[in-house]
């Protein structure tokens, strides 16, 4: 059984509230999990998804600008980590065909501006 810890980041910018669920998600190998991220500011058009292995810094999986565009980092395949964004305040990320190496903390963030 894989253990995923989904962190709640109480806003990546001053004044934004982020809710993420499920909070924890023990899953079985081969399954798919869908993580939901909701933020409360329509002006925060940038949303980010991160993966953090124990003892390491968070690594950006992908970022989306509004609902029109999602860009994955080179090491994260869009078919493994598909992201949908039905509106400015919500983003969904799935992790497809779970493997042992997918065990990590996953979290989302939102910003008014691009984060480099």
Predicted regions and their residues:
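Short glycine/proline-centered loop/turn elements that form peptide/ligand docking sites
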Residues: 15-24, 39-46, 56-57
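Residue-level detector of conserved, well-ordered beta-strand and adjacent loop positions
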Residues: 10, 19, 38, 50, ...
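Structural signature of extracellular immunoglobulin-like
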Residues: 32-41, 46-54, 94-97, 102-112
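N-terminal V-set
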Residues: 42-77
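N-terminal Sec-dependent signal peptide, specifically the hydrophobic helical h-region
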Residues: 1-23, 110-116
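Solvent-exposed, conformationally flexible loop/turn segments
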Residues: 28-30
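Extracellular beta-strand/loop-rich beta-sandwich domains predominantly from IgSF
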Residues: 23-26, 66, 72-101
């Amino acid at each position: 059984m894989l253990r995923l810890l989904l962190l709640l980041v109480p806003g990546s910018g001053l004044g934004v509230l982020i809710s993420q669920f499920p909070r924890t998600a023990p899953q079985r190998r081969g399954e798919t999990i869908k993580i939901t991220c909701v933020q409360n500011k329509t002006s925060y058009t940038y949303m980010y998804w991160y993966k953090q292995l124990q003892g390491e810094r968070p690594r950006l999986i992908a970022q989306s600008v509004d609902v029109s565009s999602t860009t994955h980092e080179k090491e994260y395949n869009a078919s493994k980590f598909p992201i949908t964004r039905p509106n400015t305040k919500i983003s969904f990320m799935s992790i497809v065909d779970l493997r042992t190496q997918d065990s990590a903390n996953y979290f989302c963030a939102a910003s008014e501006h691009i984060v480099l």
